[in-house]
Amino acid sequence: MSWRYALKNYVTSPETVNDDTVTYFDDKVSIIRDSFPKSECHLLILPRTMQLSRSHPTKVIDAKFKNEFESYVNSAIDHIFRHFQEKFRIKKSDDDKDPCWDDILKDKNKFVRNFVQVGIHSVPSMANLHIHVISKDFHSVRLKNKKHYNSFNTGFFISWDDLPLNGKNLGTDKEIETTYLKEHDLLCCYCQRNFSNKFSLLKKHLELEFNSHFELK
């Protein structure tokens, strides 16, 4: 089976998956850990109705869809917040003058506002519709190239809050991929420093950024 269909079993029969990938499922949805997480926490919400699952997210996600799946999005956000609370504490540093880090692991709204993003890829790589709920650290061994990073940190990623698109024309798939995945510079998600096309330098910088803010309990 093509890798494009790797999510199919989680949609059709999540109860048969014999690993810890599935965090929750019911008749409407499966919530799973991304098998190739691009951040410390990276969850996927998969609608189980085949009509939805086979649809393009930019075309099918409307106000009704959002209302139906909002509670699942909130559940995935809660999962990420609990994970960070249980695993990490904020590292206090005289060099860290950014107030957004003060008590971020105690204030869920602050954590979500500054450190979680929810949305879709404008050109999905997988056949089954999925919504990303991901922590904005990009601290992961699975983050391996410019395409991985820019797919979440440019206009290639469409925020849940910006949906539905209401017919907005994004361009062809090729135009979108060229603009955001190939030609767009690498900008640090913490400080906006421009790394041009130097992914290895960005990767080291992201490690330093994460470790300057978080430490294991």
From Swiss-Prot:
It comes from the Eukaryota. Gene3D superfamilies: HIT-like. The active site is at residue 130. The record marks 10 as: Interaction with DNA. DNA-binding protein involved in single-strand DNA break repair, double-strand DNA break repair and base excision repair. Resolves abortive DNA ligation intermediates formed either at base excision sites, or when DNA ligases attempt to repair non-ligatable breaks induced by reactive oxygen species. Catalyzes the release of adenylate groups covalently linked to 5'-phosphate termini, resulting in the production of 5'-phosphate termini that can be efficiently rejoined. The HIT domain is required for enzymatic activity. This is Aprataxin-like protein. It comes from Saccharomyces cerevisiae (strain ATCC 204508 / S288c) (Baker's yeast). The lineage of its organism: Eukaryota, Fungi, Dikarya, Ascomycota, Saccharomycotina. The gene is HNT3.
